[in-house]
Amino acid sequence: VLSPADKTNVKSTWDKIGGHAGEYGGEALERTFASFPTTKTYFPHFDLSHGSAQVKAHGKKVADALTNAVAHMDDLPGAMSALSDLHAYKLRVDPVNFKLLSHCLLVTLACHHPAEFTPAVHASLDKFFSAVSTVLTSKYR
């Protein structure tokens, strides 16, 4: 459960990310593919090379979904319902992959914003990404 302090940390961090969210989403996705090669199996139709336009575009989709989640932190299940359906019923993404991408998002954000990435912010973002992952995998059961 996200505390009021967690919500404040997530919102303020996401505000600082601003227009870079799509760029960071693409970088985190590329980092996920490089660090956890099995995640590539869901994207056989993508050019997965460094700097790929397809990876960047999908990373922007990830970032846009997270921006929506930040805006609706008090109703993540409602805000993410369609994405949950897509990933559970159509794409059938292994739930562990959300945790792997979340880790890579944390690393990417820490690399770009080291001064703002305090232990408290790290913990809040980790809890937020975990909450989003839980919602995205809730329909698997």
From Swiss-Prot:
The modification Phosphoserine is found at residues 3, 35, 49, 102, 124, 138. GO terms for biological process: hydrogen peroxide catabolic process. One of its GO terms (cellular component) is haptoglobin-hemoglobin complex. GO terms for molecular function: haptoglobin binding; heme binding; iron ion binding; organic acid binding; oxygen binding; oxygen carrier activity; peroxidase activity. Disulfide bonds: none annotated. The modification Phosphotyrosine is found at residue 24. PROSITE patterns: GLOBIN. O2 binds at residue 58. The modification Phosphothreonine is found at residues 8, 108, 134, 137. It comes from the Eukaryota. Residues 1-141 form the Globin domain. Heterotetramer of two alpha chains and two beta chains. Involved in oxygen transport from the lung to the various peripheral tissues. PANTHER family: HEMOGLOBIN FAMILY MEMBER, HEMOGLOBIN SUBUNIT ALPHA. Belongs to the globin family. This is Hemoglobin subunit alpha-1/2. The lineage of its organism: Eukaryota, Metazoa, Chordata, Craniata, Vertebrata.
